[in-house]
Curated annotation (Swiss-Prot):
GO terms for molecular function: C-5 sterol desaturase activity; iron ion binding. Keywords: Endoplasmic reticulum, Lipid biosynthesis, Lipid metabolism, Membrane, Oxidoreductase, Steroid biosynthesis, Steroid metabolism, Sterol biosynthesis, Sterol metabolism, Transmembrane, Transmembrane helix. A motif (Histidine box-1) lies at residues 148-152. This is Delta(7)-sterol 5(6)-desaturase erg3C. It comes from the Eukaryota. Delta(7)-sterol 5(6)-desaturase; part of the third module of ergosterol biosynthesis pathway that includes the late steps of the pathway. Erg3C is a minor delta(7)-sterol 5(6)-desaturase within the ergosterol pathway, erg3B being the major one. The third module or late pathway involves the ergosterol synthesis itself through consecutive reactions that mainly occur in the endoplasmic reticulum (ER) membrane. Firstly, the squalene synthase erg9 catalyzes the condensation of 2 farnesyl pyrophosphate moieties to form squalene, which is the precursor of all steroids. Its cofactor is Fe cation. In Aspergillus, the biosynthesis pathway of the sterol precursors leading to the prevalent sterol ergosterol differs from yeast. The ring system of lanosterol in S.cerevisiae is firstly demethylised in three enzymatic steps leading to the intermediate zymosterol and secondly a methyl group is added to zymosterol by the sterol 24-C-methyltransferase to form fecosterol. In Aspergillus, lanosterol is firstly transmethylated by the sterol 24-C-methyltransferase leading to the intermediate eburicol and secondly demethylated in three steps to form fecosterol. Belongs to the sterol desaturase family. The chain crosses the membrane at residues 43-63, 91-111, 127-147, 224-244. It is a multi-pass membrane protein. GO terms for cellular component: endoplasmic reticulum membrane; membrane. It comes from Aspergillus fumigatus (strain ATCC MYA-4609 / CBS 101355 / FGSC A1100 / Af293).
Length: 320
């Protein structure tokens, strides 16, 4: 977030705040009463940027995935809800501002220099850049695995995570269709990497590993920004319903096929990027062609006379 503000302050925000809160009215080229280090200005800037950024990423990549990857025949599945796409979009867009408010303290701590993010690659060298990327992915994967799995505990599930499982056969538009607290809690492993040890220890989430991690893993700030954005995109892509199976990468990567099975069977494939945590803790279920929800969708389409036995569209004569 500090990278974004450093870019946008001289480009747009300085002029915007000078217009809204001029230090001296009726003078040419006024400055703002709130300088760049003003905490109120930083709070407003962060909230505006996270709202615009999260919404733009969601709408752009969900649309790409929905129109170019998602198999629209899945919308005929018996468990696909009436007006589901509209509901998914509405749920996602309504959750984003609340998730942004909840994550505000961590972004604010980062902007105000309370993080372990560093500026130059030369500060720690290229080898650490690679190592920190691997550690970041591994840490987030195990953190989200256990947060996600705990959210499926009966005492928690119905209050926080159930809204996301309303979509048995999700589309990419369901990627952010969370209860806001659900989205926030699952984002904590990403945020914790950038917090200083003191700030991390004060966090409410009772996961000691998050506090320990920041003692050993500084991260280059541009790398963090890229990985953080990539995580949001990945969250969308794993909801595309693609049940490709038999590829050697499925042994290691928590693919859209794995996440499709999670939505269908609830207690499998809790991981975010990789399958190792599910495999080790006994919750892994490998994708199989027979488990593809498209089979049930095609049954409905055949009954309606929309496709033949091979799943090919039936062309009706003109005028019918």
């Amino acid at each position: 977030m500090d990278v974004a503000l450093e870019f946008l302050d001289p480009l747009i925000l300085d002029k915007a705040y000078a217009w809204l809160l001029p230090s001296e009215p009726n003078v040419p080229d006024p400055t703002s009463r709130w300088d760049r280090d003003n905490v109120y200005r930083q709070v407003i800037s962060i909230l505006v940027l996270t709202q615009l950024g999260a919404t733009s990423l969601y709408l752009f990549f969900s649309a790409l995935s929905y129109y170019f990857v998602f198999d629209r025949r899945l919308e005929y599945h018996p468990r696909f809800l009436p007006n589901q796409v509209r509901q998914e979009i509405k749920s996602s867009l309504s959750a984003i501002p609340f998730i942004n408010i909840l994550t505000l303290p961590w972004f604010l701590a980062e902007v105000r220099g309370k993080s372990m993010l560093y500026r130059s690659v030369s500060d720690y060298g290229w080898p650490w850049l690679v190592v920190s990327s691997i550690l970041y992915m591994a840490f987030n994967d195990i953190g989200i695995y256990w947060i996600h799995r705990l959210e499926h505990h009966p005492s928690v599930y119905k209050y926080i995570h159930k809204p996301h499982h309303k979509w048995i056969v999700p589309t990419p538009w369901a990627a952010l269709a969370f209860h806001p607290l659900d989205g926030y809690v699952q984002s904590l492993p990403y945020q914790s990497v950038s917090l200083s040890p003191v700030a991390a220890i004060l966090r409410a989430i009772p996961l000691t590993i998050n506090s320990v991690f920041v003692f050993i893993c500084p991260m280059q700030r541009h790398l963090y920004m890229v990985l953080f954005a990539a995580v949001q995109i990945w969250t969308i892509l794993i909801h595309d319903g693609d049940m490709i199976s038999g590829h050697w990468t499925e042994k290691f990567i928590n693919s859209p096929a794995h996440h499709t099975l999670h939505h269908m069977y609830f207690t499998v494939n809790y991981g975010q990027y990789f399958t190792w945590a599910d495999a080790y803790f006994g919750s892994h279920r490998a994708p199989e062609p027979a488990l593809d929800p498209l089979h049930d969708a095609l049954k409905v389409m055949r009954a309606k006379g929309l496709v033949d036995e091979q799943g090919n569209p039936i062309k009706k004569p003109k005028g019918e």
